[in-house]
Amino acid sequence: MKMITTDLIRGSLKTIVLKLLKENGRMYGYEITRSVEELTRGQIKLTYGALYPVLHKLEKDGILVTESGNYNNRIRIYYSLTEKGESVVTEKIREMKEFIDSLQNIINPQPGLNHA
């Protein structure tokens, strides 16, 4: 399978991160990248250069909170959703589903629909 391009990922990254945090409670950066890679069977590989700016923006916007933890004498920064984040993730998932449906209409048009 071919990897999905960076351009396609960039527009979806916020929703991907929010959905993972909703499902897992709290996660650290490397854990997020590994989960995405596993769930997509290697088709999506997040770089830290793409992930961390999104995490920092979501934190700045009050959608995520951070918590430091110590693991094997290493500091890990865990991210989790705020109450505001819980409502934002629901909206982002709805938007993404609508977007995917719209793309399906373009890629595989239904017979009889007006394509003008």
Regions found by a protein language model. Give the residues of each.
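Short, Lys/Arg-enriched N-terminal segment that forms or immediately precedes the first helix
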Residues: 1-6
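A cross-family signal for key residues in well-ordered alpha-helices
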Residues: 19, 34, 56, 90, ...
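N-terminal helix-turn-helix DNA-binding core of bacterial DNA-binding proteins
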Residues: 7-50
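Basic amphipathic alpha-helical segments that dock to polyanions
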Residues: 51-58
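Basic, amphipathic "hinge/linker" alpha-helix immediately C-terminal to the N-terminal HTH DNA-binding motif
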Residues: 71-93
